[in-house]
C-alpha cells in the first residue's frame, strides 16, 4: 500500500505543478502523472544532495513542497526540450 500512497502523493504534486505552470504539453493526464512522479523523485534527490531541510521522508508539508518544486523543475525542463 505504501508505493500506491507515494504515487498518489507525487501525482498531486504533478497536478499542482501543472496548475502553477499552465500550458499545452500534450500527453494529458498520463504526462502529468509521469512528470509528477519523476519531479518528486528529482526534488527529493536534489534536496537531500544539497542538504535542504534535513531528511525528506514521510508525508509532510516539507516533503510535499519539495515534490512540487521538483515537478515544476522537471516540467520546465520538459518544455525546454520539447521546444527545440
Curated annotation (Swiss-Prot):
UniProt cross-references to InterPro entries, sorted A to Z: Transgly_assoc
Major site of localization recorded for this protein: membrane
Cross-referenced Pfam families: Transgly_assoc (PF04226)
Domain of life: Bacteria
GO CC entries: plasma membrane
Topology of this chain in the membrane: Multi-pass membrane protein
Residue stretches spanning the membrane: 1-21, 27-47, 58-78
Family, per entry: Belongs to the UPF0410 family.
Protein name stated in the entry: UPF0410 protein YmgE
Gene giving rise to this polypeptide: ymgE
Amino acid at each position: 500500500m505504501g508505493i500506491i500512497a507515494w504515487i498518489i502523493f507525487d501525482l498531486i504534486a504533478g497536478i499542482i505543478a501543472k496548475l502553477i505552470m499552465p500550458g499545452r504539453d500534450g500527453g494529458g493526464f498520463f504526462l502529468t502523472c509521469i512528470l509528477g512522479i519523476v519531479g518528486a523523485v528529482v526534488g527529493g534527490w536534489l534536496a537531500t544532495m544539497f542538504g535542504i531541510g534535513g531528511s525528506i521522508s514521510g508525508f509532510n508539508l516539507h516533503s510535499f513542497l519539495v515534490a512540487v518544486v521538483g515537478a515544476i523543475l522537471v516540467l520546465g525542463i520538459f518544455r525546454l526540450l520539447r521546444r527545440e
